[in-house]
């Protein structure tokens, strides 16, 4: 079984199957864990090899890893009558909210299977909640998302009327504070089954309420209920429960007004959420609402909290003088990009289909007693004696440097080149909660680095067990923009995108009337959107700033000295074609026409999407898998638009017939060059001592060097590299052990064509020591009046074979002697799919058979093989267009030899 150590948490955790792994630990009576030399190297590996593990250490024990927190989200959806009225886009707001809920549940199942999601409707006709409030229906408590919820929500969308689901809309107006109270109760009743920490599990969660509504002023005429709702929102904020508003417009003329009620309900825990530009935007389309939800769906979690040491470089933190002489700034490390992987499988019990819980027990090999973690020690044998280590000592040995960033100095920003980044960068942000004053000190450092144009060079150790890396900290200034300017820019961007779409549609349309209509529509849309732009007086009243880019530092991982390679300069001859400026301008025009607006969010991994679509179809018990769109494929429409321009450029660069002349000349040159190399290299006639002295031996291939050593009765190691083989040859010649009289046994790279005799051994000197293998053959006994001997078939040219042998047709090659002398007997040889003649020898046939033995026999055994042939393959023809007639290895496809010399001399199918 395969899986991970993180199991699904569900309600039936008590009935989960327990998978127990028993480790038998051998050793003396004190029960230590003994390592070999290989295992000793493994103990220095970190606890987590993914690079995102626990960042705690001795010097920073107070830091916690936020990745251990779970995300708990309650979808609080308004079910009033106004939510079921179609908007200007003919979309129902309630349906848009439910669709967003389905998408979020699907994403959570794929990416975060331990997060909790709850669903609550308010302003309903029925009630279902713990507090027994009217007009509140809890569809699902906070729990791990289940595919059954998706089926229930999809059934709700299929029904045109909400009342068919048994809920309906309430007649009057319910107190909004009761909905907030219900959410608070749902958070307090989170099931503890999936928690490993027990009582504190409810505190280590991100708690959020996603509120979907188009009513901007609930309980407008009841100040008491409004005050209760505001107080309830403050109580939720004190419990670290955050409310995220997803507002929707009722119509074009009835926009959602945030200032009427919800500006008192939303309490921002930090400045980051307050500066979010999507917090106050109302959506009318499902795509806009989904995009807004995507930004809020996943909580921004840091990889960990790390200190930035400035000052004394001494790692001894116990020295009070060293602590006083340095400044420590608390920072949080974030991943800006990460590679998307398929989720790991989870072990399940085949009987109950519940997650398997893994338990590991360490058992002493001598006493068979279960060992506690405190009874297990580590050791390494040195001088015949075990050297014992405790866990604390092992942690000290594995800790090379203190955790965090240690400032070494500064370098100009222009010295940090783009190719210095060897992996995706990370981002650090100050954290004032761990060490007060970190934000002030960090901002001062960033400001001075920006003024001086410097980058900080630091030694970075993410974990106590990891090796330190050299990194460069690149400062980034904060960018703020007023809300009015941001909204204007968004409208102008949407206007420009619509203009581009209309221009492209105009180019594709053929009639002039359609173009004029589209131009009129374009002018009307421009006038409408210009009217939607706020006036100067409205802009002056709205001075709220929106953060476009935060202040911080990018962590650039620097390479080591041997990681940088400089390519050799390649000399370019200037006697080629002269390119005119006109053709250069054409090439520039092609590049401009092929440019697209790149948005990384539009390009997803098609393999992952297909994988998740298959899982979703299985979980929801659907017959068909939803088709996924592959946006990585080339844009065929864009390519078709530039075909004429590309052809014009090609005609201007290449003369008529240039491409065909080059291709034919190249093929003829390459074939002639290959023939010269193949026929000209004769290892038996080479002056090996002179080649070693002049250094020309380095031009030979590894197979040539091995052939020479094998000729001199020297067997090199199978892992020997080319330099090792050259050293062996140099030592052989300089030591006087060179035997030139054996060079005549060396063969050329292209061996001569085989004779009539078929050799059954593989040309291996150790063939007698190999286990013999019987080859099955289909034999037919025929009577021969005269001598019958096996001979190789005549060579047939490739061109003739293409004409005479159509695909998928059997034919036989008859022996000259047997066709002339034998009576009714014929020797048939098969030509397989690659035009190789396959001889399957019977067990009694061997190379030692001579003509006298054959003449004395009245009957002879001939092998008949009948298979179909396919079209000849180009790579199987050698030597002036002749098909392959190399000798067949007696082991055929089951041959165990891997040396290249044997593979070149014999065929195996």
UniProtKB/Swiss-Prot annotation:
The record's section on InterPro entries has: APLF_PBZ (IPR019406), Ku70 (IPR006165), Ku70/Ku80_beta-barrel_dom (IPR006164), Ku70_bridge/pillars_dom_sf (IPR027388), KU70_core_dom (IPR047087), Ku_C (IPR005160), Ku_N (IPR005161), SAP_dom_sf (IPR036361)
Q: Please state every residue range assigned to the domain named Ku.
A: 321-587
Instruction: State the function annotated in the UniProt record.
Output: Involved in non-homologous end joining (NHEJ) DNA double strand break repair.
Q: Which GO terms describe its molecular function?
A: ATP binding; ATP hydrolysis activity; damaged DNA binding; DNA helicase activity; double-stranded DNA binding; telomeric DNA binding
Reaction catalysed? ATP + H2O = ADP + phosphate + H(+)
What is this protein's record name? Answer: ATP-dependent DNA helicase ku70
- SAP domain spans which residues? 697-733
Per the record, what is one GO cellular component?
A: chromatin
Q: What EC number(s) has UniProt assigned to this enzyme?
A: 3.6.4.12
Question: Where are the compositionally biased (Low complexity) regions?
Answer: 494-543, 663-674, 777-800, 818-832
Q: What is the gene called?
A: ku70
Annotated region described as Disordered, given as residue ranges: 494-548, 663-685, 744-859
User: Which terms does the UniProt entry file under GO BP?
Assistant: DNA recombination; double-strand break repair; double-strand break repair via nonhomologous end joining; positive regulation of DNA-templated transcription; telomere maintenance
User: Cross-referenced SUPFAM superfamilies, in alphabetical order?
Assistant: SPOC domain-like, vWA-like
Compartments in which it is found:
Nucleus
Q: What is its main location?
A: nucleus
Assembly and oligomerization? Heterodimer of ku70 and ku80.
The entry's keywords: ATP-binding, DNA damage, DNA recombination, DNA repair, DNA-binding, Helicase, Hydrolase, Nucleotide-binding, Nucleus
């Amino acid at each position: 079984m395969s899986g991970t150590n993180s199991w699904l948490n569900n309600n039936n955790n008590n009935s989960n199957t327990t998978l127990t792994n028993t480790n038998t630990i051998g050793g003396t009576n004190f029960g230590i864990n003994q390592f070999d030399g290989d295992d000793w190297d493994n103990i220095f590996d970190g606890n987590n090899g993914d690079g995102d593990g626990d960042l705690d250490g001795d010097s920073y024990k107070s830091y916690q890893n936020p990745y251990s927190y779970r995300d708990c989200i309650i979808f609080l959806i308004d079910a009033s009558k106004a939510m079921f009225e179609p908007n200007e886009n003919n979309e129902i707001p309630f349906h848009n909210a439910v669709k967003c809920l389905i998408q979020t549940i699907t994403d959570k199942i794929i990416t975060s299977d331990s997060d909790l999601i709850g669903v609550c409707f308010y302003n309903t006709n029925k009630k279902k909640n713990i507090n027994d409030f009217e007009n509140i229906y809890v569809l699902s408590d906070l729990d791990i998302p289940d595919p059954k919820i998706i089926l229930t929500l999809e059934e709700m969308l299929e029904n045109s009327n909400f009342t068919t689901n048994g809920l309906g809309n309430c007649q009057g107006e319910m107190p909004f504070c009761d909905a907030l109270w219900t959410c608070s109760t749902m958070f307090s009743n989170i099931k503890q089954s999936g928690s490993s920490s027990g009582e504190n599990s409810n505190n280590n969660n991100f708690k959020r309420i996603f509120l979907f509504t188009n009513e901007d002023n609930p309980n407008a005429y009841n100040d008491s209920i409004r005050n209760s709702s505001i107080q309830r929102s403050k109580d939720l904020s004190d419990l670290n429960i955050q409310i995220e508003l997803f507002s929707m417009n009722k119509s074009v003329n009835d926009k959602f007004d945030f200032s009427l009620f919800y500006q008192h309900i939303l309490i921002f825990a930090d400045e980051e959420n307050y500066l979010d530009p999507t917090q106050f935007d109302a959506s009318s389309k499902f795509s806009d609402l989904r995009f807004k939800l995507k930004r809020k769906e996943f909580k921004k979690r840091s990889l960990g909290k790390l200190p930035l040491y400035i000052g004394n470089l001494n790692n001894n933190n116990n020295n009070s003088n060293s602590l006083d002489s340095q400044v420590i700034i608390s920072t949080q490390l974030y991943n800006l990009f990460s590679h998307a992987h398929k989720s790991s499988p989870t072990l399940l019990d085949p009987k109950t289909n519940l997650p398997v819980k893994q338990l590991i027990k360490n058992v002493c090999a001598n006493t068979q007693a279960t060992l506690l973690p405190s009874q297990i020690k580590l050791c390494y044998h040195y001088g015949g004696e075990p050297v014992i280590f405790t866990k604390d000592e092992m942690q000290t040995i594995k800790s090379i440097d203190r955790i965090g960033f240690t400032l070494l100095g500064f370098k100009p920003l222009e010295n940090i080149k783009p190719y210095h980044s060897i992996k995706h960068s990370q981002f650090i942000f100050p954290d004032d909660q761990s060490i007060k004053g970190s934000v002030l000190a960090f901002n001062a450092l960033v400001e001075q680095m920006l003024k001086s144009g410097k980058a900080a060079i630091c030694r970075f150790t993410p974990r106590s067990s990891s090796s330190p890396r050299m990194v460069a900290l690149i400062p980034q200034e904060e960018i703020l923009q007023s809300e009015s300017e941001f909204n204007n820019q968004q409208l102008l961007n949407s206007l420009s995108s619509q203009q581009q779409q209309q221009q492209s549609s105009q180019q594709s349309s053929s009639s002039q009337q359609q173009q004029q209509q589209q131009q009129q529509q374009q002018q009307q849309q421009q006038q409408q959107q210009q009217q939607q732009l706020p006036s100067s007086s409205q802009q002056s009243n709205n001075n709220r700033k929106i953060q476009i880019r935060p202040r911080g530092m990018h962590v650039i991982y620097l390479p080591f000295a041997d990681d940088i390679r400089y390519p050799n300069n390649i000399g370019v001859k200037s006697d080629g074609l002269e390119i005119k400026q006109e053709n250069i301008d054409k090439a520039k025009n092609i590049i401009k026409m092929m440019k697209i607006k790149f948005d990384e969010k539009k390009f997803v991994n098609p393999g992952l999407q297909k994988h998740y679509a298959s899982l979703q179809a299985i979980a929801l018990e659907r017959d068909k898998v939803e088709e996924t769109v592959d946006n990585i494929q080339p844009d065929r429409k864009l390519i078709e638009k530039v075909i004429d321009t590309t052809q014009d450029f090609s005609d201007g660069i290449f003369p008529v017939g240039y491409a065909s002349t080059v291709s034919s000349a190249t093929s003829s040159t390459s074939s002639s060059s290959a023939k010269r190399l193949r026929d000209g290299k004769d290892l038996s006639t080479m002056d090996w001592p002179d080649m070693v002295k002049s250094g020309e031996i380095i031009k030979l291939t590894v197979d040539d060097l091995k052939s020479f050593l094998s000729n001199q009765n020297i067997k090199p190691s199978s892992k020997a590299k080319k330099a090792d083989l050259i050293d062996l040859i140099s030592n052989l010649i300089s030591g006087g052990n060179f035997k030139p009289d054996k060079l005549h046994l060396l063969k050329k790279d292209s061996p001569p064509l085989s004779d009539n005799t078929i050799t059954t051994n593989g040309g291996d000197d150790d063939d007698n020591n190999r286990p013999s293998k019987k080859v099955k053959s289909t034999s037919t006994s025929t009577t021969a009046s005269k001598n019958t001997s096996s001979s190789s078939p005549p060579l047939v040219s490739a061109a003739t074979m293409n004409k005479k042998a159509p695909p998928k047709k059997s034919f036989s090659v008859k022996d000259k002697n047997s066709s002339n002398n034998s009576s009714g007997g014929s020797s048939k040889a098969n030509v397989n799919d690659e035009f190789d003649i396959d001889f399957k020898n019977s067990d009694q046939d061997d190379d030692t058979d001579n003509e006298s033995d054959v003449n004395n026999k009245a009957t002879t055994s001939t092998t008949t093989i009948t298979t179909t042939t396919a079209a000849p393959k180009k790579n199987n023809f050698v030597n002036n267009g002749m098909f392959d007639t190399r000798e067949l290895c007696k082991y055929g496809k089951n041959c165990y030899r891997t040396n290249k010399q044997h593979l070149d001399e014999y065929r195996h199918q």
